[in-house]
Each structure stands twice: as C-alpha cells, then as structure tokens.
C-alpha cells in the first residue's frame, strides 16, 4: 500500500510569468526567456528569474555601491543590476563604469556618462554580451526598506529592536515617560 505524500512542501515556488503591465519589461522577459533556453548560460537564467521578481525584490542600487564593488580586479567587466541605479551625492567623483540596468535615474545616468562610462539597457546589453560572460551581477539590499524596521519581536519586549507603528509624533502619542536630568 502506497503513502499519499503531501505536495504542499514539494511544489516549486517562485514566479513563472510576468505580472507587470509594462510592455518594455514584457519584451525583456521574452528576450531573456529565449536566451536562457538557447544559450547554455546560467547568467541568462538568473537574469530571467530576477526580471520576473516583484518590485520590492528588485531593490535600487546606488552608484557608490557599484563603484565600490567594481574597483581594482573587475576593471574590464560590465556591472549588471536587475533594478534601478540611483545617484549617491556622497560619492564625490564617479569612476569610469559600464553599467547595465533596468532603469537609471537622470542624475545617475548623467554622472556615469560624464565620467566616460556607459549606461546600457538590457536589450543593448544582450547584443554586446548574449551569454553574459565577463560581467558582474549586482543586487540591492532587499531588507533596506523602512517597513523591515517594524518587523521582529514586538516593540517594548526585552531584546526587541522593532519600531512601533505610531499614528503621530506629537506629545500625546505613544511616548514613554522620560526622566528629565
């Protein structure tokens, strides 16, 4: 007699189709689905998986983070970010970088181009490096969003670092009685 196993924990999770209504995004998924199938490259499979992710799982990456990760030994490589590349005012001089991303903010794009680098879209990148060789995949910090500060052990309990949800910041709203020194 056979045992009927529960498929609940055996099924594969993760998105298989695109949810976004953006036609440009849909074309990119179509392109990378083709490249993942036809080229024997793991890079294209990873890019396809990241293209299908939710917006919260495609966090932004700053120029300073890219510059820091790309310095010295990765000089000839292309930085690839499946997400938005944003500017960082704290980075005083931007090095020459070749970056491929879904989106660039205006200031980030202008700073990369002004430094003598290139800001590529994924369709331009697919023509240059269809197999994704000599590239460096970069991902933003997923848990950097403000909501994550509220998660964890309940606020007020010992060892908790979670922030409480407060309606307002005035004197009447969830303030502990502090001792005046």
From Swiss-Prot:
InterPro entries documented for this protein: Ribosomal_eL18, Ribosomal_uL15/eL18, Ribosomal_uL15/eL18_sf
Pfam families linked: Ribosomal_L18
Signal peptide start and end residues: none
SUPFAM superfamilies cross-referenced by the UniProt entry: Ribosomal proteins L15p and L18e
CC per GO annotation: cytosolic large ribosomal subunit
Presence of the UniProt keyword Ribosomal protein in the record: yes
Keywords assigned: Cytoplasm, Ribonucleoprotein, Ribosomal protein
GO molecular function: RNA binding; structural constituent of ribosome
Localisation per UniProt entry: Cytoplasm
A single GO BP: translation
Family, similarity comment: Belongs to the eukaryotic ribosomal protein eL18 family.
Protein name in the entry: Large ribosomal subunit protein eL18
Species: Dictyostelium discoideum
Phylogenetic placement of the source organism: Eukaryota, Amoebozoa, Evosea, Eumycetozoa, Dictyostelia
Gene transcribed to yield this protein: rpl18
């Amino acid at each position: 007699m056979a045992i009927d196993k529960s498929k609940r924990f055996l099924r594969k999770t993760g998105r298989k189709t695109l949810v976004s209504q953006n036609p440009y995004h849909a074309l990119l998924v179509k392109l990378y689905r083709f490249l993942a199938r036809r080229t024997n490259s793991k890079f294209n499979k990873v890019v396809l998986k990241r293209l299908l992710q939710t917006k919260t799982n495609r966090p932004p990456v700053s120029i300073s983070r890219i510059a820091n990760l790309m310095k010295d030994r990765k000089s000839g490589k292309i930085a690839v970010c499946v997400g938005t590349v944003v500017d960082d005012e704290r980075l005083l001089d931007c090095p020459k970088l070749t970056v491929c991303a879904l989106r660039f903010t205006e200031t980030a794009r202008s700073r990369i181009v002004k430094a003598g680098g290139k800001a590529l879209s994924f369709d331009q990148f697919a023509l240059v490096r269809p197999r994704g060789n000599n590239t460096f995949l970069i991902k933003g910090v997923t848990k950097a969003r403000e909501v994550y500060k509220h998660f964890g052990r309940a606020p007020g309990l010992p060892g908790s670092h979670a922030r409480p949800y407060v309606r307002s910041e005035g004197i009447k709203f969830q303030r502990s009685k502090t001792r005046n020194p």
